[in-house]
A protein has these predicted regions:
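Short, structured segments at the rim of ligand-binding sites
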Residues: 1-281
Length: 281
């Protein structure tokens, strides 16, 4: 199972008849899956996971899921919520999802999921904070225009920040729910001039880079690239709210700190993030 699909495909598989089997490499087997597996079991979906709540596991289904209400701790990943939302309308009784854990990370991704569902006539109601109801119904077909991945624009924007240069990124959407859109807010705070028009986003940096103290809990995927820019700032930077990055394909916080320090930089882990003190590399 690919990393980016390992939390989405199993829920979809519950709507098929048969016994699909899911597995991955050693890193995938270590990634958090318990919240999703427990949720599927609460929905009376038969899962054989040897009681480990990780890959590998098998799902046995007749293709019909009754749905109902579940509570889930998705503090390790918003993907657990999105995966359930995407199929909830095909459950007989729909699905109500309530997050009951610590702070929910990466809310822009959940907002993106809801926005896309509404575009195909799926009714999603926000009942309360971190509490959603997806009504049962037909999912309308649609021809989609896929936006550019704004998070992946980060390295190119970072190159202009670090070299005090200028760059245009074509086709940057004016209205988007993508986490990568926060590059605009972040790099402006670090000293860049940014212009967005109908054709492109322009970033120009002619100043020293300012360090930044920022909660990245909603945009944790931006952390590695932002850390590279912070190395060249004129003051320390602190990133918080990203403890969940320790459960990704690798411990991203530990990997960043190790590699920054190996290059001669100065980075330290904190309880929920890291601190970077700029120094010559």
């Amino acid at each position: 199972v690919l990393f980016r699909s390992m939390r989405f495909v199993p829920v979809l598989a519950a709507l098929t008849s048969g016994i699909p089997h899911f597995d991955g490499d050693l890193h995938a087997r270590k990634r958090p899956m318990k919240a999703l597996i427990d949720s599927l079991k609460k929905l009376q979906i038969s899962i054989d996971d040897q009681g480990l709540a990780t890959l590998p596991f098998s799902i046995a289904s007749d293709g019909v899921v009754q749905g109902g209400s579940i509570e889930i701790d998705a503090s390790e990943s918003s993907q657990f919520i999105s995966a359930l939302m995407l199929v909830g309308a095909r459950f007989v009784n729909g699905l109500s999802i309530k997050h009951v854990g610590k702070k929910l990370p990466s809310l822009p991704h959940i907002k993106m999921t809801i926005d896309m569902l509404k575009q195909v006539d799926v009714e999603v109601k926000e009942i309360g904070e971190n509490y959603w109801k997806i009504n049962p119904g037909i999912i309308k077909s649609k021809n989609w225009i896929i936006e550019p991945d704004l998070s992946n624009a980060g390295p190119f924007l970072a190159s202009a920040m670090i070299t005090h240069g200028e760059i245009n990124i074509n086709d940057w959407p004016k209205n988007t729910t993508q986490a990568g859109n926060f590059w605009i807010e972040i790099f402006r705070a670090m000293g860049a001039e940014i212009e967005l028009n109908d054709k492109f986003l322009k970033l120009k940096n002619s100043k020293e880079i300012s360090g930044i103290n920022i909660d990245l809990s909603q945009v944790g995927e931006l952390t590695p690239v932002l850390a590279s820019v912070a190395l060249f700032a004129n003051s320390p930077s602190q990133f918080s709210g990203i403890a969940h990055l320790r459960g990704h394909e690798t411990n991203r916080i530990a990997a960043l700190v190790e590699n920054i320090n190996n290059l001669g930089g100065d980075a330290q882990e904190t309880a929920d993030g890291l601190v970077i003190n700029p120094k010559p590399l």
